[in-house]
Amino acid sequence: EIARLIHSSSQKPNVGIDIILFDAEDWGAPNDYTGAPINEYGGYCLGSDYWSKNLHKANYSAYFGILLDMVGDKNATFRYDSESMQVAPSIVNQVWGTAQKLGFGNYFILEDGGGIVDDHVPVIRNAKIPMIDIIDLRKNDKTFFDQHHTHGDSIEVIDKNTLKAVGQTVLQVLYEEKP
């Protein structure tokens, strides 16, 4: 939807935007796997790990990246993660601050959510692109939404208000970015 809105808008952002879709983030090695390591992330983040080591353009670089992961649950809450804060605190503050200004503070919580290995980590480490993670991670038990990795993880649990909060926040950040 973000790509469609930018494409159809008569006013374009002042900066270039690349949208990259990663696959095989949740692949992971089975608990009983005894073979050679699949990658340094336990077999997770395969798509982002591959992309970050085989960039689509020679000498590709980006000022920053925003990873959107599981951003549609009705009761989603997004806390900043430690990896994002370590490499891109100004971008985290910009995104969470923008969400607050737009009235989405009930989704974008101003507190540390701890660490998580997600697709932004290989991009940060291999491609050297500061990337933040917007991910619905429950604070107290470090789990995801109730339907995560179940048959209940379907379009019926997607909430348009959550998508609106994330989409409007990201669009506002992109349109406010100066070259």
What are these regions (language model features)?
Residues 64, 71-179:
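Active-site-adjacent substrate-binding region
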Residues 1-87:
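Acidic/histidine-rich catalytic neighborhood of metal-dependent amide-processing enzymes
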